[in-house]
């Protein structure tokens, strides 16, 4: 009897264990049983931010509803929204930038006085052969630069060098301001650094700058290694960025990395910063409560519509490439399909037109990438699309993110190599870099629009509000043209 009981219980235990394994696979919350797989013509992956409920609902009530109402289409197409399973637990006001989830870690800032950016122990400063030295920095809270300075040995009486100091906005060829030091015009010496005043500018949060020291004498500069200099960052107001941290030299950078002087600065609107820091604990508590509510709403939304794949990443802009790779893993593991269409939740998609064109173009089911490709797109070294870890000045060809189609074998390759593929600043350029390794057949089609505009016959168009998406669909339903209907 005991053996008979085990015979019945073991399959159940194995089934439960298998269910739990599926539930936890790669951190994906959506369970898609292997034994109920259906073969689809297209899997549509819609990248969506956690808070974009309205955009998802508009899609559900427009073209996605249209698919479900047509049995032939619903059997051929599977649509899933791709959402990060975790929200950033830091309020936007307390992050280094709105694109990542890094705490703006400012502590004990110095207000209402000039701060010397660098000081250097005697043993750390050496007369070098380098005539041009530079250092890069990033502003994390607005500052005002007041003076530029240059090192000189304490033992020297007076200033006997000819040196120019310039401060650039990174990747710009023209200096914002500069100071020229000479025996006849040496400025004022403070703590071993000679300073001269400069025109005062507010350097905003996120500003990326480069200070360049240039010697006009036969001998080189007195300079120190950036890792041996004392950085007076005002409690975290700015940060030195170095090549040794894995970042590339900027295109217009002159000379070698080092510090041959400094600058003085004041914190702009210190009272506002103090208020931000004092109210941070309360703000974080409110934010965490809102995250819990958002989690509950997303789980309810997922249960109701059964169209969300939660991927195990913190849902921020910088993590979008990882979101996509995680979705490719899920798709390769739990679905059977011929093509995958990737789009965003703010895009208009004409899915029937996509199907018709696949048939008309007779797209191959292997090694195929169909989209609107950007060629020789310059790599940005600053700003939202900053990329410091891709060596070339231009990206490989990549399809606009509003919509593109890839064949099943490419998805399988991406999924199989997802743990080794490096992610870059955007999912579209990351895809171009990844695909350069395997060289798929690219099918160029300008009907995948890269910018927000409406054209007859378009396959996709990006950057719409929920109301605009609804209006486009209503016009398509009314007269077949989402852009305009002629009144009769």
Swiss-Prot record:
Q: Where in the cell is it found?
A: Golgi apparatus membrane; Endoplasmic reticulum
| Any one Pfam family match given in the protein's UniProt record, by short name | Galactosyl_T
Please identify the protein, giving its name as recorded. UDP-GalNAc:beta-1,3-N-acetylgalactosaminyltransferase 2
Its biological purpose is as follows: Beta-1,3-N-acetylgalactosaminyltransferase that synthesizes a unique carbohydrate structure, GalNAc-beta-1-3GlcNAc, on N- and O-glycans. Has no galactose nor galactosaminyl transferase activity toward any acceptor substrate. Involved in alpha-dystroglycan (dag1) glycosylation.
Q: Which PANTHER family match?
A: BETA-1,3-N-ACETYLGLUCOSAMINYLTRANSFERASE, UDP-GALNAC:BETA-1,3-N-ACETYLGALACTOSAMINYLTRANSFERASE 2
Catalytic reaction equation(s): 3-O-(N-acetyl-beta-D-glucosaminyl-(1->4)-alpha-D-mannosyl)-L-threonyl-[protein] + UDP-N-acetyl-alpha-D-galactosamine = 3-O-[beta-D-GalNAc-(1->3)-beta-D-GlcNAc-(1->4)-alpha-D-Man]-L-Thr-[protein] + UDP + H(+)
Q: What sort of enzyme, by top EC class, is this?
A: transferase
Lineage start: Eukaryota, Metazoa, Chordata, Craniata, Vertebrata
